[in-house]
Amino acid sequence: MAVINRTPDSFFDQGATYQLGAALEAADRAVAEGADILDVGGVKAGPGDEVTAAEEIRRVRPLVAALRARYPGMVISVDTWRAAVAEEVAEAGADLVNDAWGGAEPELAHVAAAHDLGLVCSHASGLTPRTRPHRPAHADVLGEVRGYVTAEAARAVAAGVRPDRIIIDPAHDFGKNTWHSLELTRRTADLAATGWPVLVAASNKDFVGETLGLGVTERAEGSLAVLAVCAWEGARLFRVHDVRAAKEALAVVTKLRSTGLRTRRT
């Protein structure tokens, strides 16, 4: 899943793909490098200037429409928590709604069902979108995340979303500190055991940077390490900034698993 941001203030690319032409060029590169999904975003995850639903639609709908025309067989995802945005991008040709904010707008699942879209059900610690808690605390982060995302998946099914179109995401760093995100990485197999496909969106995240003591532009290798561990433990989808590197890392993990190597359990 390749990240294609139409945001002027993205934490990683700082607006490099904000203009429509630049976003399309980034999508072309991602497809050439082997992306299976293009994930379009119009609002950065962190705090910042207010972005209304109308402005988010202005940013993402034309890009979705252009990508659908250019790549008829590509899976197009939109990173949004808003039902109104999902409605618009569904009409433009989107296939998947990537809700990183844990069902902040419950109506989103009904929109996904009405348009036969896929839906990512994530755990955001009950946060209001685009906010960060002070000193997040979880007595049992795995148990809380697993319980929440499976309940969200069940609610999506009840709303009419097809079960084979539901994905779960532990949402590293969303309402979680570095220890929590590392623990979820270590315990990916427990999330995969729920039976729902697991999405990992850890590329260049703060927990990687804090673990290594590195800034946002220096986290590529650490991000690949997280990707490899999560892939080994059963994650199925990976939201990344560098498609080529991710595909190569995943190819090695796949080869190792196919040759019979197994992790040691104690």
Segments from the language model and where they lie:
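Hydrophobic "anchor" residues on beta-strands that sit immediately upstream
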Residues: 1, 35, 75, 95, ...
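Phosphate/pyrophosphate-binding loops at sites that engage ATP/ADP/AMP, CoA/4′-phosphopantetheine
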Residues: 28-32, 152-165
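Catalytic domains of carbohydrate-active enzymes, especially glycoside hydrolases
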Residues: 25-41
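Active-site-adjacent loop and "lid" segments of alpha/beta metabolic enzymes
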Residues: 8-26, 45-69, 75, 80-84, ...
